[in-house]
Amino acid sequence: MSEQKKRLLVMAGGTGGHVFPAIAVAQYLQQQGWDICWLGTADRMEAQLVPKHHIPIQFIQISGLRGKGIKALLSAPFSIFRAILQARKIIKAYQPHAVLGMGGYVSGPGGIAAKLCGIPVILHEQNAVAGLTNSWLAKIARRVLQAFPTAFPNAEVVGNPVRQTLFSQPTPEQRFAGREGKLRVLVVGGSQGARVLNQTLPNVVAQLSDKLEVRHQVGQGAVEQVTTLYPEHASVTITEFIDNMADAYAWADIVICRSGALTVSELAAVGAAAIFVPFQHKDQQQYLNAKYLADAGAATIIPQAELTAEKLVSVLTQFDRETLQQMAIKAKAMATPLAAQRVAEVIIEEANQD
């Protein structure tokens, strides 16, 4: 009789920063013969994204409380209790050998339900500062892993699992060899587009159009509006989305973008210099993510409050290709190519203990 397949329940949802690293770990374990099931919510991005990667998904009902009215806050205990019961039912039916929490609202009830069922919980924090759910779950998790060394004082640093295609790009030395002409600037606003970048970059290009070639990802529905802001004869390509981020990063001499955890880890994986404009948040999550590469000499940080076309022109004109190549090499040195493998190894270790 063949040995029974090991089963992993993955809890991750809400944003690509949680979901994509979790998919990377899930796919690695699938290649090792594991069975994977996903716990998510039906109204967030994981509902469409996860099945496309051939991973079955189950849903519970839970949402965040930030910015909600008094009625939602008063009903929160009932909503959380209901979500725990829903997660417990799924866990009882699936009987996983381990549960991986990668963040998002779904991880809270799922983690509690797993603990109640006696299933080992392995937690991974993608950001440089832990979110509320993960801060609480860390108290009941069997193992806590982190991408950056600042989220938890005693957790193992493993990096962020990212797509392997990012690591297979040519090295910075290979990419920069023989490059001439205008500096290649990639502007990435994310799935929503970063309005502040969409408004600022056209003015930068107006001042430096003879020195820059720009690819600008503006987000859904913004192409027409942003196109009208750019000078007519500038070397600019504008798109809603970029399907192949690995190739786009590799094309660029420098990337201007937000500093979500996944973006920072992807830039390190490829080895690309960056100008980060962190999203303003009270816990400084994106600023601390950006600092990881900035402290290594691989990036510059411009706080959003200080971002003007003049400031960006000043920063860009300080760079030449030799400087940007050295920054890219430093970024590559901060990459963690074995992150997905290491998270998977910890899951296997804990599953084998029970």
Curated annotation (Swiss-Prot):
Swiss-Prot/TrEMBL keywords: Cell cycle, Cell division, Cell inner membrane, Cell membrane, Cell shape, Cell wall biogenesis/degradation, Glycosyltransferase, Membrane, Peptidoglycan synthesis, Transferase
Superkingdom to which the source organism belongs: Bacteria
Residues the record lists as binding UDP-N-acetyl-alpha-D-glucosamine: 15-17, 127, 163, 191, 242, 261-266, 286
A Pfam entry, by short name: Glyco_transf_28
GO cellular component: plasma membrane
Signal peptide bounds: none
Entry's Gene Ontology molecular function annotations: UDP-N-acetyl-D-glucosamine:N-acetylmuramoyl-L-alanyl-D-glutamyl-meso-2,6-diaminopimelyl-D-alanyl-D-alanine-diphosphoundecaprenol 4-beta-N-acetylglucosaminlytransferase activity; undecaprenyldiphospho-muramoylpentapeptide beta-N-acetylglucosaminyltransferase activity
One GO BP: cell division
Reactions that this protein is recorded to catalyse: di-trans,octa-cis-undecaprenyl diphospho-N-acetyl-alpha-D-muramoyl-L-alanyl-D-glutamyl-meso-2,6-diaminopimeloyl-D-alanyl-D-alanine + UDP-N-acetyl-alpha-D-glucosamine = di-trans,octa-cis-undecaprenyl diphospho-[N-acetyl-alpha-D-glucosaminyl-(1->4)]-N-acetyl-alpha-D-muramoyl-L-alanyl-D-glutamyl-meso-2,6-diaminopimeloyl-D-alanyl-D-alanine + UDP + H(+)
Membrane topology of the entry: Peripheral membrane protein
Subcellular localization(s) per the UniProt record: Cell inner membrane
Family annotation (CDD domains): GT28_MurG
InterPro entries attached to this UniProt entry: GlcNAc_MurG, Glyco_trans_28_C, GlycoTrans_28_N
Pathway entry: Cell wall biogenesis; peptidoglycan biosynthesis
Gene3D superfamilies for this protein: Glycogen Phosphorylase B (3.40.50.2000)
Keyword Cell inner membrane found: yes
Cysteine-cysteine disulfides: none
EC number: 2.4.1.227
Homology family: Belongs to the glycosyltransferase 28 family. MurG subfamily.
Role, per record: Cell wall formation. Catalyzes the transfer of a GlcNAc subunit on undecaprenyl-pyrophosphoryl-MurNAc-pentapeptide (lipid intermediate I) to form undecaprenyl-pyrophosphoryl-MurNAc-(pentapeptide)GlcNAc (lipid intermediate II).
NCBIfam families in the record: murG (TIGR01133)
Name of the protein this chain belongs to: UDP-N-acetylglucosamine--N-acetylmuramyl-(pentapeptide) pyrophosphoryl-undecaprenol N-acetylglucosamine transferase
Native source organism of the sequence: Pasteurella multocida (strain Pm70)
Taxonomic lineage of the native organism: Bacteria, Pseudomonadati, Pseudomonadota, Gammaproteobacteria, Pasteurellales
